Amino acid sequence: MDIIQKLTEELQVKKWQVEAAVKLIDEGNTIPFISRYRKEATGALNDEQLRDLGERLTYLRNLEDKKAQVISSIEEQGKLTEELKAAIEAAQTQVAVDDLYRPYRPKRRTRATMAKEKGLEGLANIILLQMTTTPLETEAESYLSEEKGVATVQEAIAGAMDIIAESISDEADYRTWIRNKTLKEGEITSEAKDEKEQSVYETYYHFSQPISKMAGHRTLALNRGEAEKVLTVKIVAPETEILSYLESRVITRDNPITSPTLEEVVKDSYSRLIAPAIEREIRNLLTEQAEEGAIRVFGKNLEQLLMQPPIAGQTVLGWDPAFRTGCKLAVVDPTGKVLDTVVIYPTAPQNKVKEAKATLKKLIEKYHITLISLGNGTASRESEQVIVELLKEIPEKVQYVIVSESGASVYSASKLATEEFPNFDVGQRSAASIARRLQDPLAELVKIDPKAIGVGQYQHDMNQKRLSEALGGVVEDSVNKVGVDLNTASAPLLEYISGITKTLAKNIVTYREANGRFADRRQLLKVPKLGPKAYEQCAGFLRIMNGDNPLDTTSVHPESYEAAMKLLTSLGYSAEDIIGGGLKGISKKVREPKKTAEELGVGELTLKDIVQELEKPARDPRDEMPRPVLRSDVLDMKDLTPGMVLKGTVRNIMDFGAFVDIGVHQDGLVHVSEMSERFIKHPLDVVKVGDVVDVKVLAVDVAKKRISLSMKLQ
């Protein structure tokens, strides 16, 4: 297989782009580095395209390795033909290779292998040839052997039938046809093990769906229901047509002696050997497809959550709500430093609302708090009521935001949190984290395992290694798109920077603590174990504010500094002119980009990036995202009525719709059919996590805590 050609066709890009990307990946370059600094080489393939290419490259190389192993194994057995070798080499999937290898794979002891040991292969061949005019009972007599354990003609014929059944099952073409037929025309069904038992799976108690139309979230729901022993799940294949197909291939002569036996063998081969295997394969295929879809959605949700704009310049009060143990508060200044921590008890069972308000007033006055970040966990509704009442009583203009506290408890009990806040308890750490994730979501959320952030579906049922790899890639891409301040970034944030390992991240922080702030990017080369390759990969993503070189505040790579300086000089500027907001309008002065790029010795795409950075250094792509909805009043679910139009924030996205926070402590669901007047294939085509949207209330069920919303306002 020509892997480069295959990738070119799959990704629908030029062959030279794939060749360049593969070469760069093989040389040890990271995806963010290739995407940002090797645009000319790859034709500006983005990070998503490069990750897809990398994953497929690994799969196809593994496939080629497997083919080589299979060919070698069959050759050692002395059974390799040119035709078989060509078929294996042409196989496009691991399943196709497995089908071709099946007859030659070393087998565990089966009914067929035991029959062969008893010397019944000859009788099986007689039946398969379909030429005999002698009754099978008579043919079988010569295969009787007390020594081999064949006592009767019935045992001999049964053994021969087992051999034929396995040979039919091992036929690659048959399996391919049956698999495709079942995928195209089969159904997946589920039944309740106990219909009287109430469960979240009631939708699937009498469920049937064509395999070809099976939605990923339904597959994952069936898998979970089956694992919890609530459902029985089956694949229903077009059996009559499949048996007819097999008989037409196996029974080639109308022989009254062998045909009835072969009909019986075909049924046995299909029901006992082929059907269970095909069912497993199809269930696995559906699960893989569902998991990939769910991981893709999870990744998109995570990216959008990480890329939410920071709220800079405000002192924030982080509020971790609780009942019995009290609400933990943390005052965090605009730099993320914790100024104070307090515990108040406005909720049951203590209900010390008056005392809590007095404490809050003092904190707001003392630290000039302008924003409260309230976690959405237990007791958040009661806490919000206290906040709203307080805001009406004080002269200061303070607003609040309800933030997801998913993962905050995981972080607060972690080794990292203990190192960061050694004198705080878990509640105080959690409150600080809740405040910081509003100030800078990216910097705070990277400290938490992406799987704990709570924007996925069925994440605990998936292949955890694959999920971790995919989500790690999303975090890496997000961190590198934004870039980090080399002098303030934490080790967990630095870990995600291109080319920086966990060890290097710790070494950078240790070096910074021992030697003071970095004044120049080149100082990175003094960090233990950070060599030229790591420097090349990471330098452009690490910013130095107020350093020796103004270009260090930009994402211009040091390898392009000479070109950037030549450009500045030719336009009558110096590097110092970048300081204080950049060179507005510089892009208009570069009138002949192709000629200018040639003169500077860089590509046009690199020149464009340099100009963009000089025009607006340290620009933050998150600034273009919708900002959180700041609130000063509260709604109750009972206040909602159909037809009411509200502003809300998209909190999570699933295959079937989006959950929107409208400020009533219960996210409402906008079903995919209610997102637009036009047909929508997937919610991600319309919305993303963090989007602020106008929604209309369709229905409210207070008892079941369900709110149905629509984005179709007309």
Give the residues covered by each predicted segment.
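Low-complexity, acidic/Ser/Thr- and charged residue-rich accessory regions of DNA metabolism proteins
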Residues: 139-153, 207-208, 245-270, 274, ...
